[in-house]
Amino acid sequence: METTVSLVQMLDARERRVQHQQELLARYHKPLICFTMNICGPVKDSPLIRRGFARGRQLLRQQFLRAKLTPLYQDAVREVTGCEAFYVLDADPLTIKKFTTDIEDATPLGRLFDMDVIRPDGLKVDREELNLEGRRCLICGGPAKVCSSRRIHTVAELQEKTTEILTEARDAQDIADAARLAVRALLYEVTTTPKPGLVDRRNSGSHKDMDVFTFMDSAAALYPYFEACARTGRETAEQPAPETFAALRPLGCEAEGEMLDATGGVNTHKGAVFSVGIVCAALGRLDRSLWAEAARVLAEVSAMTAGLTEKDFAGVTAENAATVGQKLYIRYGITGVRGQVEAGLPTVLNIGLPVLEEGLAKGYDFDRVGGGALLAILANSTDTNIIARSSRERQLALTEELKALLVQTPYPDKDALAALDDRFIAENLSPGGSADLLALTWLLHFVTTEGNIDE
């Protein structure tokens, strides 16, 4: 519930803020940034406002990195009277003012940032010292001081515009981050080396028509698609979850075409177009605060695809089964990736992700961790690619063999993985379904560990 604040509360907060500034200046004798939000009206704190504030802090950190500056001191407070952050920097005040005004002027969201730069003597650095114009009005773009002094715009108008700016900035960041992490996951999957029978940096596995560069081309081509999936999720978030999934179908068809264009007709990521696209849409449907909960993200995947298996296999018989997936469903009841997403990707949640994160906690490198997660996934799921390239019997025997291996060595080293790779290639085996689940495992790892930007 949003809390309104009184004028007295705001004056008290301002007094405390000034006192804190004076304490920091007296302690460090260095310039100081005081960052607050320009929020009109009696509500100064909300989840949406905090998201905007977090984005502002992120942009400041990026400027510090660009300028090779490490704050001598930094802290942040969140009160009903608003968010505040303080940074003490050993740098020229005008240099600091230049990059804070760059942030303030770069985007509509920047208009809501108030990044004061205070000299060691306590005086603020003015924009005019950099020959910059004053701040612009949120609504009309005119001089903010003029509009404010004349009260040209009502509080309601300013609040509506503020909400619009904050919402658009939040959605744009969430959509871009979902797509970025999705592409990153695809790249981590293909570069994990060695991977038995799969394309990696060592070789092309059991494939003759693709290599690691083919996969990189494909992953890059899919970024706009993953953005579109996340955007669709956000735009349909208030609708029943299956409606979001239905809206993805035409996007997926278009993405397959982009993939084939990028690879010269090679199917590198058809499975990932389906499964990773669904996860991106699920992220779009969810508030960013829920990204840290893998089970919640995958529950959304399950809700979106409810009834998918029954619907897609309705009417399929032994006589008319045409695809590998249809034939395996009729003969063995294997539901493949449809069953995985409809169940909320249990192999990712219960096998891949725990193995990946435990390996990282042990300090193993990405190759060894990724290899261990891949084998655990392959040993605890039904990879239809393995069956298609051999038989159901070989797939079952392989899973038992891998389970025994993983009991002894949960994270096989490079030599052991390379030996497995050679064996898989000799048998023409390629666990492509497990590779897709490994990519999803990396994606969920990135989302849960890096998705929460609210410091």
What are these regions (language model features)?
Residues 164-241, 245, 283-422, 449, ...:
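Phosphate-rich cofactor/ligand-interacting catalytic cores and adjacent structured alpha/beta frameworks
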Residues 257-270, 361-362, 422-431:
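A short glycine/serine-rich beta->alpha loop
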Residues 1-67, 78, 98, 102-171:
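Long, contiguous binding/interaction regions
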Residues 32-92, 210-237:
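Short, well-structured hydrophobic secondary-structure segments
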Residues 426, 430-453:
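Short, amphipathic C-terminal "tail helix"
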Residues 275, 371-378, 437-444:
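Short, structured motif recognition centered on aromatic/hydrophobic residues
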Residues 45-46, 93-100, 291-296:
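Short, conserved charged micro-motifs
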Residues 228-284:
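Long, hydrophobic/aromatic-enriched structural stretches that serve as scaffold segments
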